[in-house]
Amino acid sequence: MTLNVDEEVERLKEEIKRLAQPRPDGSYVVKFGVLFSDDRCANIFEALVGTLRAAKKRKVVTYDGELLLQGVHDNVEIVLLKPPTQATQAEGVGA
């Protein structure tokens, strides 16, 4: 089964929520090493780092650096950003 990038980003969001600790602001945070070593994620994502980069480009997640490597960057926090509220989305229309 091949997922397109948008589908992979949606799956990534689900997996981060499953593995992460929620924050009071509505975001979720998980260490890269936890994501990378999770069996379920390994089975879903052919290229986890590529999916993370696509999600970062879409402003779905944020993390320090550009390229994450297993071992070296295991403690880097991946933050699933809180989705914008309807009011925030409406403010952006026509801007």
Swiss-Prot record:
GO biological-process terms attached to the record: regulation of actin filament-based process
Pfam families registered for this protein in UniProt: Costars
InterPro entries: Costars, Costars_dom, Costars_sf
Protein family per UniProt: Belongs to the costars family.
Record-given protein name: Costars family protein WS02710_H03
